[in-house]
């Protein structure tokens, strides 16, 4: 089974990017998440992402590195495992430029040469210990995932966009039929206590938001075609949103669709994955990286991080302690 990785990245210090952003919005606005510095800034840790892939997941077939034509100066673009992808290579021109990561994600299946089985990474998701293909895909080729509900009553932009996804899911799928058909997948003992809410709301007639581990996500490329066939008007409308919006859809639509189509195998992703909001858990993030407690970690940025420079120095030292050697992706 060929498995590819896809990662999106932006360098907000690039003069051309700044010019394009200024034309679309004007200036960075840290009072609004969708326009904030944390949405676009680079930690300088990208080399550790590549080192982690090479050391902990050397089996990957190809890395599709998606940018708006940017690349770090240290990146060896001649590496045969690397495919540089410009937004213009796979996103319709009428939706570009975009500063909305969800638009980049709607069209991932159109990346030239992408394998049917792929794993999508944001640039704050890192591999920190040996990770086999079976972490992402079962032997039968289906993605490993966790199908459990969570309450989503939040007022944040992110919470609202997740509810937009669920409205579409309920339009196309019958919850009671899906849970009956795939009982063993939805009520797998693999999930442990994470499935408590699913059990509690079993009789409720509508889908809720599915729990999001917020880390590297395995997909079937064919899932994207299926969602586009069913939801083209909604996805095309959402693609016009140059910046994040309350009326957005998100990649969780594709993931939830995949689950509702029974195109997954149960796996409790929380057992080896952890998200660390750096605003409140910077020390825990550093400790987890140094001790390699998880296969995957997310270091989630915020403009409200106290002692930002010190936090970044500590994180870099932690990554350097487990990934000190240059990868073949570095010049």
Predicted features and spans:
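ER/Golgi luminal nucleotide-sugar-dependent glycosyltransferases, focusing on the catalytic module
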Residues: 1-119, 126-331
């Amino acid at each position: 089974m060929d498995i590819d990785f896809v990662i999106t990245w932006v360098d907000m210090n690039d003069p051309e990017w700044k010019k394009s952003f200024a034309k679309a919005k004007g200036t960075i606005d840290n009072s609004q998440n969708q326009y904030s510095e944390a949405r676009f800034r680079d930690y300088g840790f990208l080399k550790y992402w590549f080192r982690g892939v090479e050391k902990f997941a050397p089996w990957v077939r190809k890395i599709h590195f998606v940018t708006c034509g940017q690349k770090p100066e240290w990146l060896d673009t001649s590496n045969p495992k690397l495919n540089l992808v410009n937004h213009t290579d796979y996103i319709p021109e009428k939706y570009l430029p975009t500063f909305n990561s969800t638009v980049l994600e709607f069209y991932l299946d159109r990346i030239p040469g992408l394998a049917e089985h792929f794993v999508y990474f944001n640039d704050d998701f890192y591999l920190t210990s040996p990770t086999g293909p079976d972490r992402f895909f079962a032997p039968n080729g289906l993605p490993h995932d966790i199908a459990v509900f969570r309450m989503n009553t939040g007022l944040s932009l992110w919470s609202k966009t997740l509810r937009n996804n669920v409205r579409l899911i309920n339009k196309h799928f019958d919850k009671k039929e899906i849970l009956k058909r795939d009982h063993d997948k939805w009520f797998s003992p693999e999930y442990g206590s994470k499935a408590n809410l699913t059990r509690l709301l079993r009789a409720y007639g509508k889908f809720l938001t599915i729990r999001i581990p917020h880390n590297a996500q395995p997909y079937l490329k064919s899932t994207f075609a299926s969602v586009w066939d069913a939801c083209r008007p909604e996805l095309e409308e959402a693609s016009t949103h140059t910046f994040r919006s309350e009326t957005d859809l998100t990649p969780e639509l594709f993931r939830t669709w995949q689950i509702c189509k029974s195109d997954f195998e149960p796996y409790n992703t929380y057992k080896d994955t952890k998200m660390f909001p750096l605003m409140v858990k910077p020390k825990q993030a550093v400790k987890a990286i140094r001790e390699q407690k998880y296969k995957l970690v997310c270091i989630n940025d915020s403009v409200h991080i106290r002692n930002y420079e010190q936090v970044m120095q500590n994180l870099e030292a932690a990554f350097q302690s487990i990934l000190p050697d240059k990868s073949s992706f570095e010049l």
